């Protein structure tokens, strides 16, 4: 009987760009020696839409609907960074009530993003049940968004100097009810997932990143905090009204996929604490800085008259961006989301550079998966939490 010769050469496999574990149109060219990963090369750009160039031909108000297409699971954060930049350039004050409403919406968006990370991440490593559970809570958040903004996703809710509309009657009570219910949901996830021996086998000690290594790679968000670095821009930059709430930065020191899971689960609990405090202490007053409507380029134009502004039509304000450079950032669910803005005395930005957290965090993937098993690629990629809309822009 002839025994077939065993081949020793390496095998090159394409994962994606339409693989169910890729979380978007990401392609990985993986070099395998049996089950062992020798090399991994991510191929990006399938979802590139020229978002930075589009910004250079739009006013800020015109550009707002575009930004929700970067990270389409946490759209409030892309809107927040878009209005924060001209607010800082023009030294525009945001009313206290608007600041509280923004914080509530941002933290609800953070929870929704973490939930839609948790479900597919668990499905990737073989646990199907949580995938259906997370949609139950996520639907409740989207119902709250729809009641306040009119849209479940792509809200277009933030405005320069405030928000588009005040919270509707009964919304605060409905949101407080959700917070009480969601805390029991998190406890349910902890029982179902955290101590599950099969889950621990798949994630414990997989994809370890040291603290110094995380800093050198420029990682941010849960990726950085899971490696022992207590860095959260809400505490570091003191933006918005976060200093008025009692909450803690969540971090772990192991740096593996389990640590990243624990950080995100704990962050959802902290977000609920922030939302509850904001809802109970929300002040009265305007939800928008109405003086912003006077910041039009043609200050003495007839279009600024009371009849045109408040009785007839409400044209979009065109803000003249002063000739200076500015970098602003927020703590998005996936990490540091930043905008580098250059103005040149025009209503259009001269340069609009996006610093997406997913793109920076994805850089470390090839190093993490080398010398690991093929099945660990799903675990590691899922624990990074990427959205290709913001990676490719």
UniProtKB/Swiss-Prot annotation:
Pfam families: Complex1_49kDa. Transmembrane segments: none annotated. GO terms for biological process: photosynthesis, light reaction. It is found in: Plastid, Chloroplast thylakoid membrane. SUPFAM superfamilies: HydB/Nqo4-like (SSF56762). It catalyses: a plastoquinone + NADH + (n+1) H(+)(in) = a plastoquinol + NAD(+) + n H(+)(out); a plastoquinone + NADPH + (n+1) H(+)(in) = a plastoquinol + NADP(+) + n H(+)(out). Its EC number is 7.1.1.-. It comes from the Eukaryota. Keywords: Chloroplast, Membrane, NAD, NADP, Plastid, Plastoquinone, Quinone, Thylakoid, Translocase, Transport. It is a peripheral membrane protein. GO terms for cellular component: chloroplast thylakoid membrane. It is an enzyme of class 7 (translocase). GO terms for molecular function: NAD binding; oxidoreductase activity, acting on NAD(P)H, quinone or similar compound as acceptor; quinone binding. NDH is composed of at least 16 different subunits, 5 of which are encoded in the nucleus. Belongs to the complex I 49 kDa subunit family. NDH shuttles electrons from NAD(P)H:plastoquinone, via FMN and iron-sulfur (Fe-S) centers, to quinones in the photosynthetic chain and possibly in a chloroplast respiratory chain. The immediate electron acceptor for the enzyme in this species is believed to be plastoquinone. Couples the redox reaction to proton translocation, and thus conserves the redox energy in a proton gradient. This is NAD(P)H-quinone oxidoreductase subunit H, chloroplastic. It comes from Platanus occidentalis (Sycamore).
């Amino acid at each position: 009987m002839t025994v077939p010769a065993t081949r020793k050469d390496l095998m090159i496999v394409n994962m994606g760009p339409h693989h169910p574990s890729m979380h978007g149109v990401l392609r990985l060219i993986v070099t395998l020696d049996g089950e062992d990963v020798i090399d991994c090369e991510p191929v990006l750009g399938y979802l590139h839409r020229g978002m930075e160039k589009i910004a250079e031909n739009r006013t800020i108000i015109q550009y707002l609907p575009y930004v929700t297409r970067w990270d389409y699971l946490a759209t409030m954060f892309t809107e927040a960074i878009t209005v924060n930049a001209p607010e800082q350039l023009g030294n525009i004050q945001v009313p206290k009530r608007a600041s509280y409403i923004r914080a509530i919406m941002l933290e609800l968006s953070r929870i929704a993003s973490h939930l839609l990370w948790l479900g597919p991440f668990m499905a990737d490593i073989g646990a199907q049940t949580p995938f259906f559970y997370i949609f139950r809570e996520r639907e409740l958040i989207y119902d709250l968004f729809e009641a306040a903004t009119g849209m479940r996703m792509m809200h277009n809710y933030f405005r320069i100097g405030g928000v588009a509309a005040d919270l509707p009657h009964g919304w605060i009570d409905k949101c407080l009810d959700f917070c009480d219910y969601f805390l029991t949901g998190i406890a349910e996830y902890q029982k179902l997932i955290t101590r599950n021996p099969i889950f621990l086998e798949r994630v414990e000690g997989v994809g370890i990143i040291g603290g110094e290594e995380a800093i050198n790679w420029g990682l941010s968000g849960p990726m950085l905090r899971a490696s022992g670095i207590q860095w959260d821009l809400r505490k570091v930059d003191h933006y918005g009204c976060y200093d008025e709430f009692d909450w803690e930065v969540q971090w772990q020191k192991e740096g593996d996929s389990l640590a990243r899971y624990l950080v995100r689960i704990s962050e959802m609990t902290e977000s609920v604490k922030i939302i509850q405090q904001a809802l109970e202490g929300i002040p009265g007053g305007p939800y928008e800085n109405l003086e912003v409507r006077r910041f039009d380029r043609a200050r003495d134009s007839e279009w600024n008259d009371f009849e045109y502004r408040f009785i007839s039509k409400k044209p979009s304000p065109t803000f003249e961006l002063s000739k200076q450079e500015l970098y602003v950032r927020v703590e998005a669910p996936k990490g540091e989301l930043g905008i580098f803005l250059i103005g040149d005395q025009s209503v259009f930005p001269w340069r609009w550079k996006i610093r997406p957290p997913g793109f920076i965090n994805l850089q470390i993937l090839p190093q993490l998966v080398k010398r690991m098993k093929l099945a660990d690629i799903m675990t590691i990629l899922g624990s990074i939490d990427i959205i290709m809309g913001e990676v490719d822009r």
